[in-house]
Amino acid sequence: MKVKIISYSLSKGGAAKAARNFLHLATKNKKYKSEMISVSGTLKDGVLFKASRLSVYWHYSKMLVSRLLTYFILNDKNIKCSLNIFDSNYVLKHMKEGETQKSVIHINWVNNDTISLFSLAKLFENKSERIILTLHDEWFYCASEHYAKYNSLCYITGYDDSDFINSYIFNLKKKINFDNVVITVPSYWLYERAKKSLLLRNSEIYILPNYIDTNIFTELKEVRSKRHRILGVPEDAFIIGFGAVSGGVNPLKGFDLLLSALDKVLSKINDKNRIVLLTFGANDIDKRVTSLGCNIINMGVISNSYNMAEIYNYLDVMIVPSRVESFGQVAAESLACKTPVIAFDYSGIKDIVTHQRSGLLAEPFSVDSLALNISSFMNMTEKERYVYGENGRDDVVRKFGETVVSEIYFKLIDYVRGVEDEE
């Protein structure tokens, strides 16, 4: 039986990583013949079949037009918006290619005009299709925005006609029939939000956590024992981690909140060089960090999971100051490496970090509370922090390990296929 996993990207961003992990799980099950289809190509049996340059360039030109239109939206410009008024011809073609009655289409993050709302409506309306739709953000039940503004109820009540583009996109989504689609979300927070939403409140929704490879993301004792020497910092240095695909550019990742909190913490410390801020996810160091006065190390863009695991093992604590996370991939990977996490007590991160067990959760989005939690970790002994890390790994293995997630995923695939298709 074929399982076709659809995603805008094969590798860039947390949603692509989650989709690729689903491919990894499906590939290990001999019942399924799986592949991952993206704008840039198809990954099948470990081989990448690239889309033509013309196909990619044509798609990017459509993306550009769509993106230009988003500048007329009345939303907060800090929140990503997508219209999905165009399709990737490559994705549509390969999604239908070789399809059989037993094929399952697993749609992941398909914004950036991977599949248009018009094509999604046709696909979802077809009762012969077997579809799993995984939400990686709030776009499917909002209008154009990927996350509803904090305390906004538009996704529940609808959008004002004065906001023409958002109103138009939301009305297009209202015409989509989700009855034939099984929807999954990675966290309880996203489940509750989707169930409250005007568009998905009557839909069939299940929690399918993101899979964490706990064989790769694990404690590396040799790396941890030599971390200060590897980084060239004092043996008593306290190493704080922060990472995001776009570095500090994306305001949803909360880098500004972390900087303000660190400024408060460092103002009470004489030897600021003992504090190390290690960043990753962008090649350039954010200029705002230079004013902190502490030791800054930027690891750049990390595309290899093994290298990422090493970085988590360098840290005393990983800080995830995001204003919103549908899941919290970085937090889960860090805990799997036995590195505790500080975050805000909000959104999907609450499924991952347990306050005073595997990390500390600050009051949303209080700089003072975040600073207090950083200071609390700094004042702990290494042994006390290690207990947090051990608890975190236990939780990740139990909730997001291969055995648990694959069981849920395979049951959903078989459920979508229908009892009559069971072999």
Which residues are covered by each model-predicted region?
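A charged, aromatic-enriched C-terminal amphipathic alpha-helix characteristic of glycosyltransferases
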Residues: 386-414
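Short hydrophobic beta-strand element within catalytic cores of glycosyltransferases
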Residues: 340-343, 353
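A short helix/loop element that forms part of the nucleotide-sugar donor recognition site in Leloir-type
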Residues: 218-233
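Nucleotide-activated donor-binding/catalytic signature segment of Leloir-type glycosyltransferases, i.e.
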Residues: 269-270, 274, 281-306, 314
